[in-house]
């Protein structure tokens, strides 16, 4: 139990900005390969932050959703947003695989990243002020689940970096990652099934596109897949609830 708790804390330290104190971990690299099992746990916190902002927007206007986006992105989603922007700049560049990887590793914001990044924020804002608040819990959890799906179908594009540390990926980790999504099944069966299907579809497509564009996945691609999965789930649920 204590060992699993350390893995969960490591997961939070890896994919969020929460100030987590881990102490000395002699088996850090081994634990890193286990953290995908807990990605979906992390998703509940930003989901509840966005849920609160969306719910309070009925009484507090734009202030509540604005603050929730600022907090949610600062603590959780900016890390993935950076990966999304780098991925867009790399994938949409008409060049070789090695050149795309170079563009992504430099992290310079190009025109593709600016345009689609702004578009993402606009769509997210429109949703948080109009959609049923509970959709954000589904979106955030299954956005993280999408990263697990990407790992199932992928290989590392390079032998270094954050993404490479998660390989070789143990597919058994998908079992606990899926189990941690089951509380959402109690909220709404239909929304759960639609969300998990969307995550699998988006994750599979991203893995195949990434393999074609750069020969595998990187940490940027994994981070970007989280937000792509999240926004796809939100857009679909927008028409269901």
UniProtKB/Swiss-Prot annotation:
Swiss-Prot/TrEMBL GO biological process terms: cobalamin biosynthetic process
GO MF term list: adenosylcobinamide-GDP ribazoletransferase activity; cobalamin 5'-phosphate synthase activity
Transmembrane segments: 34-54, 55-75, 109-129, 133-153, 165-185, 186-206, 221-241
Cofactors named for this entry: Mg(2+)
Source species, domain of life: Bacteria
GO terms under cellular component: plasma membrane
Record's function text: Joins adenosylcobinamide-GDP and alpha-ribazole to generate adenosylcobalamin (Ado-cobalamin). Also synthesizes adenosylcobalamin 5'-phosphate from adenosylcobinamide-GDP and alpha-ribazole 5'-phosphate.
The protein's name in its UniProt record: Adenosylcobinamide-GDP ribazoletransferase
Family, similarity comment: Belongs to the CobS family.
Listed Pfam families: CobS
Entry EC number(s): 2.7.8.26
Membrane association type: Multi-pass membrane protein
Sorted UniProt keywords: Cell inner membrane, Cell membrane, Cobalamin biosynthesis, Magnesium, Membrane, Transferase, Transmembrane, Transmembrane helix
EC primary class: transferase
Claim: ATP-binding is one of the keywords in the record: no
InterPro entries hit by this protein: CobS (IPR003805)
Taxonomy of the source species: Bacteria, Thermotogati, Thermotogota, Thermotogae, Thermotogales
Catalytic activity from the UniProt record: alpha-ribazole + adenosylcob(III)inamide-GDP = adenosylcob(III)alamin + GMP + H(+); alpha-ribazole 5'-phosphate + adenosylcob(III)inamide-GDP = adenosylcob(III)alamin 5'-phosphate + GMP + H(+)
Predominant location category: membrane
Pathway assigned in UniProt: Cofactor biosynthesis; adenosylcobalamin biosynthesis; adenosylcobalamin from cob(II)yrinate a,c-diamide: step 7/7
């Amino acid at each position: 139990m204590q060992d699993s708790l350390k893995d969960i804390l490591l997961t939070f330290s890896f994919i969020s900005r929460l100030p987590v104190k881990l102490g000395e971990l002699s088996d850090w690299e081994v634990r890193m390969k286990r953290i995908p099992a807990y990605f979906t746990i992390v998703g509940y916190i930003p989901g509840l932050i966005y849920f609160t902002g969306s719910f309070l927007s009925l009484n507090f206007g734009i202030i509540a959703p604005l603050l929730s986006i600022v907090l949610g992105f600062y603590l959780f989603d900016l890390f993935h947003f950076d990966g999304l922007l780098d991925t867009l700049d790399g994938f949409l560049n008409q060049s070789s695989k090695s050149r795309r990887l170079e563009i992504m590793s430099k992290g310079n914001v190009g025109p593709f990243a600016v345009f689609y990044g702004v578009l993402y924020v606009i769509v997210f804002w429109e949703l948080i002020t109009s959609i049923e608040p509970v959709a954000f819990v589904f979106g955030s959890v299954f956005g993280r689940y999408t990263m697990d799906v990407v790992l199932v179908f992928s290989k590392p594009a390079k032998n270094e970096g954050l993404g490479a540390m998660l390989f070789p990926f143990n597919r058994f980790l998908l079992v606990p990652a899926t189990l941690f999504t089951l509380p959402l099944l109690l909220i709404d069966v239909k929304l759960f099934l639609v969300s998990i299907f969307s995550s699998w579809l988006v994750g599979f497509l991203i893995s195949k596109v990434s393999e074609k564009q750069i020969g595998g996945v990187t940490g940027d691609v994994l981070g970007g897949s989280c937000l792509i999965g999240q926004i796809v789930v939100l857009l679909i649920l927008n028409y269901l609830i």
